Regions:
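Charged catalytic cores and adjacent phosphate/nucleic-acid-binding surfaces used
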Residues: 1-15, 26-69, 121, 126-129, ...
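Ser/Thr-glycine-rich phosphate-binding loops at phosphate-binding pockets of nucleotides
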Residues: 19-22
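Active-site gating loops and adjacent loop-to-helix segments of metal-dependent hydrolytic enzymes
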Residues: 62-104, 147-148
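Alpha-helix-centered segments that form part of catalytic cores
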Residues: 90-126
Length: 223
């Protein structure tokens, strides 16, 4: 799925604010942001970080400068294993017209050397927002990996793939109670993007829609 395709399908689904969260990189964010603006979507920059524990964590930033600075530190603790495109596909860097600019040689989704708490603190230092991705999924979900939802780091946000799972999960895992819940499709292919926006949020009228969403999330980042 290319940055421009993701932006275009997001517009068709009625999305007002969107972020591209590739595994452990933000290098397609400029192309995605440009495509979003062409489609009338307000963009955020993002990454789906894989922690040392193999937990996926959504990391969001207001601008590419902050995201790129964050990526630089993340990459200082990357595990360098060559990608095998025949198994994992090509990891392309593209522009907003879907033209290929380059390719990442090392496999991106691997665990980094950043532990969960360290990663949380790193995002904070770079002015971002972070929360555990797809907490109700077995693969790379925080609960599946740790066996519980921890009190530390003090996550105030949790992402679900299915909001119908919230009652059973909050009953079983007390630290999930009272958090701000977001929805994420975890779309890796075009057909996985919902036909209609599946999550809405009340935000103030100040600034751009992306700025408003970001500030709401920032206000909930700490439990």
């Amino acid at each position: 799925m290319t940055p421009a395709t993701a932006a275009g399908l997001s517009r068709l689904s009625g999305v007002d604010v969107a972020a591209l969260t590739d595994h452990n990189t933000v290098r397609n964010d400029p192309a995605f942001a440009e495509a979003c603006e062409a489609y009338g979507i307000s963009p955020l920059c993002g990454m789906e970080l894989t922690t040392a524990e193999e937990i996926h964590m959504v990391c969001l930033f207001l601008n590419y400068e902050a995201a790129a600075s964050f990526e630089k530190e993340v990459w200082s603790r990357r595990v360098h294993i060559k990608n095998r495109p025949e198994y994992f596909g090509h990891q392309l860097r593209m522009n907003a017209d879907d033209e290929v600019l380059g390719e990442e040689d090392d496999l991106l989704p691997n665990a980094t050397g950043w532990g969960l708490t360290e990663a949380y603190e790193l995002v904070e230092r770079h002015g971002g927002v972070c929360f555990p991705a797809h907490v109700d999924r077995d693969a790379n979900g925080i609960i599946a990996v740790l066996g519980t939802f921890p009190a530390d780091p003090p996550f105030g946000i949790a992402e679900f793939r299915d909001f119908g799972n919230i009652p059973s999960y909050t009953e079983q895992y007390p630290n999930l109670r009272g958090l701000f819940y977001t929805y994420g499709s975890d779309a890796h292919r075009p057909e996985a993007i919902p036909e209609q926006a599946a999550f809405t949020m009340e935000v103030p009228d100040d600034g751009t829609p992306a700025e408003a969403v970001f500030e709401v999330l920032r206000s909930h980042m700490r439990r």
